[in-house]
């Protein structure tokens, strides 16, 4: 028997299989990644949207931040995190006082409120400090270990007297020369850039004893040795130590520096020059005039 009603779709020639888009959707629903997104991703997006809506209220956000701040403060102010005092080692009393002035702290305070790196940079920036380490020791002690600069010379400049280390870095001002009679005196523009050479000259001038008054940098090129009685030994730019040794040897043999001499000029090594004092020059001219008569 034939059915009374025929399938109209078959009469029209329509394919009973699903459409391309329907087939793709069915395949997508069977994909593990899409199933995971439906199971986990959609709930997460819903929760994120709800949280965003809830936090959009200013009062709620302020209450949360206040709670977090209180919890943090309660943790940071626990006794084991509190710093009670500062200890400075390796520095003189004056330098320790200067360090405490540079990094003023109101104890007790939490160790979380201390920026140790910034404190160290500020301490090392002080002229008398060569290096420093800053750390918090058990027991709530802020320990600062300082390596001070060692002054080796005193530099006389238009602003006064300044102690200088071997690298020419300023250590600190000096009120008067007699505060550090153990240090040699240098002067002149650019003298601090040649401290090591000045120290070599100072050691070579040892036989001059207490007659030595200082070493002056002239024209930022060479040195003058300044003695008492306004005498000067004018050294050349090259080989100043050797030139000074020759003058000292000449003085040992002939006592040249004990005579009425103002300048011993060694700037021209092949032609050293001696300048007599005005009194000695006048006497010499008188002797010549008498000898001509």
Curated annotation (Swiss-Prot):
Q: Which family does it belong to?
A: Belongs to the FtsQ/DivIB family. FtsQ subfamily.
TM regions (residue ranges): 28-48
Q: Does the keyword Cell cycle apply?
A: yes
Q: What does this protein do?
A: Essential cell division protein.
Q: What is this protein called?
A: Cell division protein FtsQ
- Identify the main location: membrane
| GO cellular component assignments | cell division site; plasma membrane
Mind listing the UniProt keywords for this protein, alphabetically?
Cell cycle, Cell division, Cell inner membrane, Cell membrane, Membrane, Transmembrane, Transmembrane helix
A GO biological process of this protein is: FtsZ-dependent cytokinesis
Query: Which residue ranges does the entry give as Periplasmic-facing topology?
Result: 49-293
Q: Does the keyword Cell cycle apply?
A: yes
Q: Which residues lie on this side of the membrane: Cytoplasmic?
A: 1-27
Localization in the cell: Cell inner membrane
Record membrane topology: Single-pass type II membrane protein
Domain named POTRA is located at: 81-149
User: Pfam families attached here?
Assistant: FtsQ_DivIB_C
Name of the gene: ftsQ
């Amino acid at each position: 028997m034939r059915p009374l009603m025929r399938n109209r779709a078959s009469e029209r020639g329509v394919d009973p299989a699903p459409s391309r888009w329907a087939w793709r959707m069915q395949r997508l629903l069977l994909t593990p990644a899409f199933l995971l997104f439906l199971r986990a991703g959609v709930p997460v997006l819903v929760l994120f949207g709800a949280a965003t809506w809830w936090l959009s209220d200013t009062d709620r956000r302020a209450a949360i931040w206040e709670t977090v701040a209180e919890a943090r403060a309660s943790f940071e102010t626990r006794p084991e995190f509190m710093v009670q005092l500062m200890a400075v080692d390796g520095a003189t009393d004056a330098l320790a006082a200067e360090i405490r002035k540079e990094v003023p702290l109101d104890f007790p305070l939490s160790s979380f409120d201390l920026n140790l790196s910034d404190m160290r940079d500020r301490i090392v920036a002080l002229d008398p400090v060569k290096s420093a380490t800053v750390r918090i020791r058990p027991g709530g002690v802020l320990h600062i270990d300082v390596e001070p600069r060692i002054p080796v010379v005193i530099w006389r400049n238009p602003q006064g007297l300044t102690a200088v280390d071997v690298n020419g870095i300023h250590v600190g001002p000096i009120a008067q020369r007699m505060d550090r009679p153990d240090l040699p005196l240098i002067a002149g523009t650019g003298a601090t850039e040649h401290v090591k050479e000045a120290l070599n000259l100072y050691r070579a001038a040892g036989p001059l004893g207490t007659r030595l008054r200082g070493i002056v940098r002239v024209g930022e090129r060479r040195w003058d040795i300044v003695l008492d009685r306004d005498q000067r030994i004018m050294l050349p730019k090259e080989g100043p130590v050797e030139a000074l040794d020759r003058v000292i040897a000449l003085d040992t043999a002939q006592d040249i520096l004990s005579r009425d001499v103002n300048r011993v000029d060694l700037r021209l090594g092949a032609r050293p020059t001696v300048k007599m004092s005005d009194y000695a020059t006048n006497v010499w001219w008188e002797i010549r005039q008498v000898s001509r008569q």
